Regions:
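Extracytoplasmic/lumenal domain signature
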Residues: 1-11, 15-357
Length: 357
């Protein structure tokens, strides 16, 4: 463990760029932390719950609000939610904001360096230019919890209407494919095989053709899949509400291994490849609601490393330049370094924790 800092309850995933890690809290704060100096560069009070992950593009940090979190996650959509653009070079000063009608759980993405795309619980997909102008919208038949994915020419996103949609950058619908179950995970794209991987609330992992949405194969787990797929060569990896982490062959969906944790796995895994001179296999890292971070061998599925937190983990790891960042509902942001030995089951109660609010 390189450091740990207390920020406040988080389910969003951290992002890192140029030695600065950014994350947001359910209590409505955004933090910019210097990775190596282990200190807060700046923090911004938004004043509304933030549950989707931030997007950093050029000098803009995009954040979105989820005001219904204040009362009840199942309450009706709040009528005042915002998409904010903050200037990272000016201590998070607001550049622009856009008001929309629905809560935002979906995390934004940038397409072809031109537009920001995001989904909302008001069933609408929004596309904005870099100045915050809405350039097109599209209404689906259900709330959108899924985050968009892009290959820079097309946009893919799932909806609670059990459909996954494909658009061009002008918002024209290319295709939609109805699957079995609500879609709340984020699509993952595999360029080499023109494949799209997505899991559903009915517990089915699908492989679709990116060009037309046709089903190549499907694999049934039996429990909701909220985790998004990580891809490594010819295998995919994802977590499931049945407490397991799965590895499937990307070409036909046959199972290679599965590993059971102590609770649901909503976190999306990340994988690291071994070096050519490394005798060890590559690693998969993922969090679980059982309050542990897991490190598994991607070839064997063997547990190589496990670290306890003080509450469940819904966020996904972020790995940049030998540093791994992951946040927890315990209010702590963890930074691990693979240049230091990762101690198994080391209690965080014995670690110095900086409180930053």
């Amino acid at each position: 463990l390189f450091w740990v800092i207390e920020l406040g309850p988080m389910i969003s995933s951290a992002i890192s760029h140029n030695g600065i890690v950014y994350n947001s809290t359910i209590t409505g704060r955004i933090f910019a932390i210097d990775v190596y100096k282990k200190k807060i560069n700046w923090q911004k009070e938004i004043g509304s719950p933030l549950v989707s992950s931030l997007l950093l593009y050029d000098n803009l940090l995009i954040s979105c609000t989820f005001n219904s979190w204040i009362n009840d996650i199942n309450s009706k959509p709040h009528d005042r939610n915002f998409i904010y653009a903050l200037d990272i070079n000016n201590e998070g000063k607001k550049k622009w904001d856009v008001q929309i009608s629905g809560d935002i759980f979906s995390s934004p993405c940038v397409c072809n360096r031109k537009i920001i795309v995001i989904g909302s619980l008001d069933s609408t997909i929004y596309a904005l230019d870099m100045r915050g102008n809405i350039i097109w919208t599209f209404n689906t038949g259900g709330s959108i919890w899924s985050s968009p994915a892009t290959n820079n020419y097309e946009i893919f996103i799932g909806s609670d209407d059990c459909c996954i949609y494909s658009f061009d950058l002008n918002g024209n619908l290319k295709w939609k494919s109805m699957l079995e179950g609500k879609i709340r995970a984020t699509p993952s794209l595999m360029k080499s095989t023109n494949s799209l991987f997505i899991g559903t609330h009915n517990g089915i992992m699908y492989c679709l053709n990116q060009s037309d949405g046709s089903i190549k194969w499907k694999y049934e787990t039996g429990k909701p899949i909220l985790s998004s797929v990580a891809i490594s060569k010819d295998h995919i990896f994802f977590g499931c509400s049945d407490k397991k982490i799965y590895s499937l062959k990307s070409t036909n969906g046959s199972i290679k291994w599965k590993y059971e944790t102590g609770d649901k796995v909503w976190s999306s895994p990340v994988v690291t490849q071994k070096n050519d001179d490394d005798k060890e296999e590559g690693m998969l890292y993922v969090g679980s609601l059982d309050s542990h971070i897991y490190g598994l061998g991607i070839e064997s599925g063997r547990l190589n490393w496990k670290f306890p937190t003080m509450d469940g983990i819904e966020s996904s790891p972020c790995i940049v330049k030998n540093k791994m960042f992951i946040s927890s509902k315990d209010g702590l942001l963890y930074c691990f370094s693979n240049q230091q030995k990762m101690d198994n089951e080391k209690s965080i109660l014995n670690l110095p924790i900086r409180k930053c609010f």
